[in-house]
C-alpha cells in the first residue's frame, strides 16, 4: 500500500510579496511565508442545539435558596460573555515529540528525573481541558448535587429509624459529611488551580482503570465526560461517605416539608437517570458543547436573581465557615485583591507569595471553635492536608499531583531560605516540554549547516539566504519547524518587579522549550559565523499568561472601541492569525520539520504524517477576527514588490486603524542585489578613478555620470562632484595625442559611444531585449548625434567663460521639448571636466536648479544655498542675503568658477520678476565668478520679460530646432546598430516621419519603437507594426471625436497645424489660419464657395473651443511690426515724461498697424499636438497636406 499524498492547507491564495517586520526592508514571498493571511480559513461557529433540562435547573435553584452556601458574588464576576484561555485551548491542539523517543514512548521531565510513560492511545480531538470559569461552575454544581443526594439519604434514614436518639446521631453524621464535602470541594478547586499550568500533561499521561474503592469527588475530566450522569456518581459516593464520617450537630430547618420534596426528587432523579443512559449511548458531545452546557447552567441560576440576592445577604456571615484553605486560592481571589494590592500574576514566582498571604489572612480570622480548628490544621500542616487530597485523586491525575505536592512542600518547609530551588521546580512545571541547556547542547552538537547560495542577496553587513541545509536536510522559507527557544527571549512574559526578575534570570537562561514556528528568512553577518533564522512562532501553551492578560484587560474595558487602548504595539500591528510574534534565533537550534494545519478536516485527511510526531493543528484566533488581517492600503504597489526592486515598506495595521495609520513608508537603506551589470560598471569606475583635491572653500566638485542620467533624471536639484567617469578607451586616446589643443573630441566621443553601447548590452542575449533596452529613455550616450552645431556653441561659451573667470556670462537656450537641450549642456560639461582633469582648464563647480521642483520661485535661493554651502538652508530671505553677499564681493578671492544651470526657468517668473532679475544680475558683477545657463521650453520668454531682465539676456541666445525626419532616423539606426535584423528600414522611416510631422520630439520616436518591439516579440518589425504602436500610444477619446468631425473641420485643424510648424509659436494669428484655409479649399476643388462664408468660420471655431481643442487668445505681433518702437509705444501707451517736460497726457490707443497686419485674435492648441495629428493622419486629404508641409 502506497501512502496517501500529503494534503497541505493553502493559507493564502495571492502570490504577493511583503517585507519582513524584523529586518525592515527584506522582501519576502508571501506565497512561501503564508502565515500572515489565511483567506481560506473557515471558522465554524459553536453549535447551539443544546437543551437545558428544567428539572436540573429547578433542583439547583432550590438548593441555592435553601442552603445558601455559594458565594454568588464571585461567580457573577466570571459571568461574562468573553472568550477565555481554556476555551481557546479547545481549538488549538498540541502535539509534541521529545528528544529521546524510543518505541513510541515519551519521557516526561518530573523532579529532575525521567519517567517513561506509555503513549499508545491515539489522541482524541474532542477531549481537551475546559475553561477555568466553566470548571469552577461544574465543581459548584457537583457539590450541590452531592448535597441534594445527601439530603435524600438523610430523609430515608429518618423515615426508617424507630429510635429518636439514633436519629440524632445519624443526623450529626450526615451534617458532618456536608461540611467535609464542602471542604473537599474547595480543595478540589485548589487542585484544579494548581494543575492549570500543567493542563497539557494529559496528552502524555497513560490512562489506567479507575479504582472504585477510593472516595473522592469527580475530577474535571470526569465531569466533562459524564456531565449527563452526575447524579448517579455523586449518590453512590455519598453513601460511602456517610458510613465513614463522624457525627455533628444539624440545623433545625430540616422539616417535614423537606422530606416530601426529597421523595419527589428521588423519583425525578430516577427518570433523569434513564434518559441520561439513552442519550449517553447515542450522543458523543464535544468539548465545546460541554462548555456551552456549563455556561447555560450559569446563566440559568443567575436569572433567578431575586432568590439569590435575598439569600446572599443572609449567607455572608455563614460563608466565613466555608473560607478557602491556604491551598485553595481561586481566580476570583486574584480579581478581588487587585484593587487592594498589585494584581497577582499566574507565574511560578508568586505561588509562595500567594500561599503566605492566605496563611496570614486565615490566622487573623475569628470564627467558631470547630472552624478555627480546621484553619489551624490547614495552616500548620499544609503538606499533610494536601497529601490527603492527592490520595483521593484518580490515578490518571497522579503526575499532576506530584507537581503540586512539590510546590506546597517546598514553600512551607523553607520559608526563610532563598527560593531558587523552589523557583526552578515551579518554573519547569509552568512550561511543558522543557529541556536543560545540557540536553539541547547534546542534540545540536553534531549538527552541520551548509549555506545554499542560490537566490541569496546582500543586506547591510551580511547576506540573506532563502534556504540552508542542516544535517543534509534542506530548510527553506515558509516551512514549519520545531525550534528550541529560551523563555527569557519571550517578549510576552508578564511584567514583574526587578527584584523578582533577578531571582529567575539564571533559571530561565538554562531552560529551553520546543516551540512551533514558520521560517521567514536566514541571515548571516559578515562579522560573525552564526547563521540566524527569522521565525514566526505559533500559539503555544507557554503563552497562557499572555492570553490571560488580554482577558483581564478585556474585562476591564467599558466598550469594545476602547479595547485597543489596553493592547501593546505588538498586538495592535501584528494581529496575526494563529501566531504570536516574529523573532530572530540561532539556526542551529532548529529541531525538525513539521506540518501545521488550520482546519480539522485537512488535519484528519493527512494520514501520512503521524500524530505527535510531525503533525499539528493550529486554529487559534487572538482577537476572533474572521476577515483578512494583513492589509496593504495601496494595491497599485503590489506589482512593484519584487525582490530588490522596491523601496517601500508596509506595516500590518488593523482594519480600524487603517484610515488613521497610513502604512506606506520609505526605507532609507535599500537592498543591494547581486547585479552583474552594476558590478562590471563599478569595477570600471574603480580602475579609472583619480581624486584631485580642489581649493574650493564652500563647494564641492562635480560628479559627472551623464551616461547613466536620463533627460528626466535632472528633476531633483543636487550638487555634483567632479570625478572621473569616462571609459578607458577615451582616456587612452587622449593620452596618445601629443598636442592637447588639437584633440578631435568628436571622433573620440563617437568611439566612446560605441564602447558604451557594447558594455550596456554585454549581458543581454535576446535581440528583442537588446532593442527594447536601447529604446529606453535612460540610455543617453555622451555623444549626441545631429547636435554638433549646438554642442560647439555651448562648448565655446562655457570654455571662454571659465577662462575669463565667469565675468558677465549668461546663455539662454530655448526649444521644443525633446530636442536635446539639457542633454547637450551636460555632455559639454563632461567634456570640460575632462579638460579640467588634464589641467587644460581651471577647476569649476556645477550647480543646478529645476524650476518644476521649486515650490515657490523664492525657494530657488534656498536650493542654491544648500548646494553652495552643503548645509541646511535658512528661510528664503536669509538665503538670498548670504548668497548676494558672496557674489557682490569687492575684492577678488580664490573661489573657483561656478556654473549655474536653471532648467524650466519659465516656472520662476513672478509678477515683479524679482527672482529672475536677481539671478540674471549676479553674473554681471565683477567678482561673482558665476556663469548662468537658462533653459526654457518656450520661444518667447525674453519677450515676456521686463526690460531690465531682457537686457541681461542680450549676451547670448541659442535655439534648438525640432529634430527632422532624417535626423530621427539616424538616431534610431545608431541605437539599433547591434540588432538591425529585427526591424525593417521602412518601419524606421515611417516612425521618424510620423514624429517629425508632429513635434520632432525624439522621446516620442523611442516610445513608438519600444512599443512595437514589445507587441511583436520575436518577429521582425514592419511599417504596419509602427502604425499599431502609434495608435496605441496616442489614441484617445479625443482622437476618435476628431475622426467623426466633418471634412471642413479637419481641414481647418490641418491649416492650424501647418501654421504652427511655420511660425513655431504657441499662439497662431487667426487671420493666417483663415487665409491658409481659403487656399486649401480653392485648390482642392471641393465645397467651392465655403471659403467666403464668415458664419461657417464662427461655427467651426465655436465648436472646436467647446470640445476643448482650441483656445482663443489675444495676439499682438510686436517684433514683426516695428523693431524700432518700444513695447509701451506699440501697445499704445504713452511713455512717461521726464520731470520738467510739459507734454500733454493722451489716451491709450492701439496702434493701427496691428489691425493691418493680422488682427488682435489668436488661436492656441489646448491639447497635445500629437493627438490631433494622429487623428488627422487617418484622413487621406489631411495626411497629404501634413506630409507635404
Curated annotation (Swiss-Prot):
Gene3D superfamilies: 1.10.8.60, P-loop containing nucleotide triphosphate hydrolases. It catalyses: ATP + H2O = ADP + phosphate + H(+). A motif (PIP-box) lies at residues 913-922. Residues 1-53 are annotated as: Required for peripherial nuclear localization. ATP binds at residues 780, 815-823, 904, 937, 1003. Residues 304-320, 353-381, 395-411 have a biased composition (Low complexity). Possible candidate for an effective malaria vaccine as determined by epitope response in sera. Residues 239-421, 679-749 are annotated as: Disordered. Residues 321-339, 695-709 have a biased composition (Polar residues). Disulfide bonds: none annotated. InterPro entries: AAA+_ATPase (IPR003593), ATPase_AAA_core (IPR003959), Cdc6_ORC1-like_ATPase_lid (IPR054425), ORC1/CDC6 (IPR050311), P-loop_NTPase (IPR027417). Leucine heptad repeat repeats lie at residues 137-143, 144-150, 151-157, 158-164. The modification Phosphothreonine is found at residue 2. In schizonts, may be phosphorylated by PK5; phosphorylation leads to ORC1 dissociation from the telomeres and var gene promoters, translocation to the cytoplasm, where it is degraded by the proteasome. It comes from the Eukaryota. Keywords: ATP-binding, Chromosome, DNA replication, DNA-binding, Hydrolase, Magnesium, Merozoite, Metal-binding, Nucleotide-binding, Nucleus, Phosphoprotein, Repeat, Telomere. One of its GO terms (molecular function) is DNA replication origin binding. Residues 254-279, 385-394, 710-724, 733-742 have a biased composition (Basic and acidic residues). Belongs to the ORC1 family. This is Origin recognition complex subunit 1. It comes from Plasmodium falciparum (isolate 3D7). The gene is ORC1.
Amino acid at each position: 500500500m502506497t501512502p496517501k499524498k500529503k494534503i497541505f492547507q493553502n493559507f493564502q491564495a495571492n502570490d504577493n510579496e511583503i517585507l519582513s517586520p524584523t529586518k525592515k526592508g527584506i522582501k519576502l514571498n508571501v506565497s512561501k511565508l503564508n502565515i500572515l493571511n489565511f483567506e481560506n480559513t473557515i471558522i465554524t461557529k459553536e453549535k447551539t442545539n443544546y437543551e437545558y433540562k428544567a428539572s436540573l435547573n429547578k433542583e439547583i435553584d432550590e438548593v441555592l435558596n435553601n442552603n445558601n452556601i455559594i458565594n454568588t458574588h464571585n461567580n457573577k464576576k466570571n459571568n461574562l460573555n468573553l472568550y477565555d484561555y481554556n476555551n481557546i485551548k479547545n481549538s488549538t491542539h498540541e502535539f509534541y515529540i521529545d528528544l529521546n523517543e524510543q518505541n513510541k514512548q515519551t519521557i516526561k521531565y518530573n523532579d529532575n528525573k525521567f519517567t517513561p510513560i506509555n503513549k499508545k492511545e491515539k489522541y482524541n480531538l474532542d477531549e481537551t481541558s475546559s475553561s477555568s470559569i466553566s470548571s469552577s461552575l461544574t465543581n459548584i454544581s457537583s457539590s450541590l448535587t452531592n448535597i441534594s443526594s445527601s439530603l435524600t439519604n438523610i430523609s430515608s434514614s429518618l423515615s426508617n429509624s424507630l429510635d429518636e436518639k439514633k436519629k440524632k446521631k445519624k443526623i450529626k453524621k450526615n451534617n458532618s459529611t456536608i461540611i467535609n464535602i464542602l471542604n473537599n470541594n474547595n480543595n478540589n478547586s485548589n487542585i484544579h488551580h494548581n494543575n492549570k499550568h500543567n493542563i497539557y500533561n494529559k496528552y502524555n499521561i497513560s490512562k489506567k482503570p479507575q479504582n472504585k474503592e477510593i472516595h473522592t469527588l469527580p475530577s474535571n475530566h470526569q465531569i466533562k465526560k459524564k456531565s449527563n450522569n452526575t447524579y448517579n456518581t455523586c449518590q453512590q459516593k455519598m453513601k460511602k461517605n456517610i458510613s465513614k464520617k463522624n457525627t455533628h450537630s444539624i440545623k433545625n430547618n430540616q422539616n417535614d416539608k423537606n422530606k416530601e420534596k426529597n421523595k419527589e426528587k428521588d423519583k425525578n432523579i430516577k427518570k433523569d437517570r434513564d434518559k441520561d443512559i439513552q442519550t449517553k449511548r447515542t450522543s458523543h458531545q464535544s468539548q465545546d458543547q460541554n462548555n456551552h452546557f456549563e455556561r447555560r447552567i450559569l446563566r440559568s441560576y443567575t436569572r433567578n436573581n431575586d432568590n439569590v440576592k435575598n439569600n446572599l445577604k443572609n449567607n455572608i456571615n455563614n460563608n466565613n465557615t466555608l473560607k478557602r484553605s491556604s491551598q485553595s486560592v481561586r481566580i476570583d481571589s486574584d480579581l478581588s485583591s487587585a484593587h487592594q494590592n498589585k494584581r497577582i500574576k499566574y507565574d511560578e514566582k508568586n505561588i509562595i507569595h500567594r500561599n503566605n498571604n492566605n496563611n496570614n489572612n486565615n490566622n487573623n480570622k475569628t470564627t467558631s471553635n470547630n472552624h478555627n480548628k480546621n484553619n489551624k490544621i490547614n495552616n500548620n500542616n499544609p503538606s499533610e492536608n494536601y497529601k490527603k487530597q492527592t490520595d483521593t485523586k484518580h490515578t490518571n491525575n497522579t503526575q499532576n499531583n506530584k507537581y503540586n505536592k512539590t510546590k506546597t512542600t517546598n514553600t512551607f518547609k523553607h520559608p526563610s531560605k532563598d527560593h531558587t530551588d523552589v523557583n526552578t521546580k515551579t518554573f519547569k512545571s509552568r512550561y511543558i516540554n522543557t529541556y536543560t541547556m545540557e540536553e539541547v547542547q547534546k542534540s545540536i552538537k553534531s549538527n552541520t549547516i551548509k549555506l545554499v547560495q542560490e537566490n541569496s542577496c546582500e543586506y547591510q553587513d551580511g547576506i540573506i539566504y532563502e534556504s540552508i541545509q542542516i544535517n543534509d536536510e534542506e530548510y527553506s522559507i515558509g516551512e514549519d519547524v520545531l525550534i528550541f527557544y529560551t523563555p527569557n527571549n519571550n517578549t510576552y512574559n508578564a511584567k514583574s518587579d526587578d527584584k523578582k526578575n533577578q531571582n529567575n534570570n539564571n533559571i530561565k537562561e538554562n531552560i529551553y522549550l520546543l516551540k512551533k514556528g514558520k521560517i521567514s528568512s536566514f541571515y548571516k553577518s559578515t562579522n560573525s559565523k552564526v547563521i540566524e533564522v527569522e521565525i514566526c512562532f505559533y500559539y503555544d501553551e507557554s503563552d497562557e499568561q499572555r492570553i490571560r492578560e488580554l482577558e483581564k484587560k478585556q474585562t476591564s474595558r467599558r466598550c469594545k472601541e476602547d479595547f485597543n487602548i489596553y493592547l501593546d504595539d505588538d498586538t495592535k500591528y501584528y494581529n496575526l492569525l494563529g501566531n504570536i510574534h516574529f523573532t530572530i534565533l540561532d539556526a542551529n537550534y532548529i529541531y525538525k520539520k513539521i506540518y501545521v494545519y488550520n482546519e480539522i478536516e485537512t488535519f484528519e485527511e493527512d494520514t501520512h504524517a503521524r500524530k505527535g510526531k510531525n503533525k499539528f493543528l493550529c486554529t487559534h484566533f487572538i482577537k476572533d477576527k474572521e476577515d483578512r488581517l494583513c492589509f496593504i492600503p495601496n494595491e497599485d504597489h503590489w506589482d512593484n514588490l519584487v525582490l530588490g526592486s522596491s523601496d517601500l515598506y508596509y506595516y500590518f495595521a488593523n482594519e480600524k486603524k487603517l484610515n488613521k495609520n497610513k502604512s506606506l513608508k520609505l526605507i532609507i537603506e535599500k537592498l543591494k542585489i547581486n547585479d552583474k551589470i552594476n558590478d562590471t560598471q563599478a569595477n570600471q569606475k574603480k580602475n579609472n578613478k583619480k581624486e584631485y583635491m580642489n581649493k574650493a572653500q564652500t563647494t564641492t566638485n562635480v560628479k559627472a555620470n551623464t551616461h547613466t542620467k536620463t533627460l528626466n533624471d535632472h528633476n531633483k536639484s543636487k550638487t555634483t562632484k567632479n570625478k572621473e567617469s569616462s571609459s578607458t578607451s577615451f582616456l587612452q586616446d587622449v593620452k596618445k595625442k601629443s598636442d592637447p589643443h588639437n584633440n578631435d573630441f568628436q571622433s573620440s566621443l563617437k568611439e566612446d559611444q560605441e564602447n558604451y553601447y557594447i558594455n550596456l548590452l554585454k549581458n543581454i542575449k535576446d535581440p528583442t531585449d537588446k532593442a527594447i533596452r536601447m529604446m529606453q529613455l535612460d540610455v543617453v550616450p555622451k555623444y549626441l548625434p545631429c547636435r554638433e552645431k549646438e554642442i560647439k556653441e555651448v562648448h565655446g561659451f562655457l570654455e571662454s567663460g571659465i577662462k575669463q573667470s565667469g565675468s558677465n556670462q549668461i546663455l539662454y537656450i530655448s526649444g521644443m521639448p525633446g530636442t536635446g537641450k539639457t542633454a547637450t549642456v551636460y555632455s559639454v560639461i563632461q567634456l570640460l571636466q575632462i579638460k579640467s582633469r588634464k589641467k587644460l582648464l581651471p577647476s569649476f563647480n556645477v550647480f543646478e536648479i529645476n524650476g518644476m521642483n521649486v515650490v515657490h520661485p523664492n525657494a530657488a535661493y534656498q536650493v542654491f544655498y544648500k548646494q553652495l554651502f552643503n548645509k541646511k538652508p535658512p528661510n528664503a530671505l536669509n538665503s538670498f542675503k548670504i548668497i548676494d553677499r558672496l557674489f557682490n564681493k569687492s575684492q577678488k578671492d580664490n573661489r573657483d568658477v561656478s556654473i549655474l544651470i536653471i532648467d524650466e526657468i519659465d516656472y520662476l517668473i513672478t509678477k515683479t520678476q524679482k527672482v529672475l532679475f536677481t539671478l540674471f544680475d549676479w553674473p554681471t558683477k565683477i567678482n561673482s565668478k558665476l556663469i548662468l545657463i537658462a533653459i526654457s521650453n518656450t520661444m518667447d520668454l525674453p519677450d515676456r520679460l521686463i526690460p531690465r531682465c531682457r537686457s541681461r539676456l542680450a549676451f547670448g541666445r541659442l535655439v534648438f530646432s525640432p529634430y527632422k525626419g532624417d535626423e530621427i532616423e539616424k538616431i534610431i539606426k545608431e541605437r539599433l546598430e547591434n540588432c538591425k535584423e529585427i526591424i525593417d528600414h521602412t518601419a524606421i522611416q515611417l516612425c521618424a516621419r510620423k514624429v517629425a510631422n508632429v513635434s520632432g520630439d525624439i522621446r516620442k520616436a523611442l516610445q513608438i519603437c519600444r512599443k512595437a518591439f514589445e507587441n511583436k516579440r520575436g518577429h521582425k518589425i514592419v511599417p504596419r507594426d509602427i502604425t499599431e504602436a502609434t495608435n496605441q500610444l496616442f489614441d484617445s477619446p479625443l482622437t476618435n471625436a476628431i475622426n467623426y468631425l466633418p471634412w471642413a473641420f479637419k481641414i481647418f485643424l490641418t491649416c492650424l497645424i501647418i501654421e504652427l510648424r511655420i511660425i513655431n509659436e504657441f499662439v497662431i494669428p487667426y487671420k493666417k489660419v483663415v487665409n491658409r484655409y481659403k487656399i486649401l479649399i480653392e485648390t482642392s476643388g471641393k465645397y467651392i464657395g465655403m471659403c467666403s462664408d464668415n458664419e461657417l468660420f464662427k461655427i467651426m471655431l465655436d465648436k472646436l473651443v467647446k470640445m476643448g481643442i482650441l483656445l482663443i487668445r489675444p495676439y499682438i505681433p510686436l517684433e514683426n511690426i516695428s523693431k524700432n518702437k518700444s513695447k509701451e509705444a506699440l501697445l499704445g501707451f504713452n511713455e512717461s515724461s521726464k520731470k520738467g517736460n510739459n507734454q500733454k497726457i493722451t489716451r491709450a490707443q492701439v496702434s493701427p498697424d496691428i489691425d493691418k497686419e493680422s488682427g488682435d485674435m489668436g488661436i492656441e492648441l489646448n491639447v497635445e499636438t500629437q493627438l490631433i495629428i494622429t487623428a488627422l493622419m487617418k484622413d487621406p486629404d489631411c495626411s497629404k497636406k501634413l506630409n507635404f508641409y
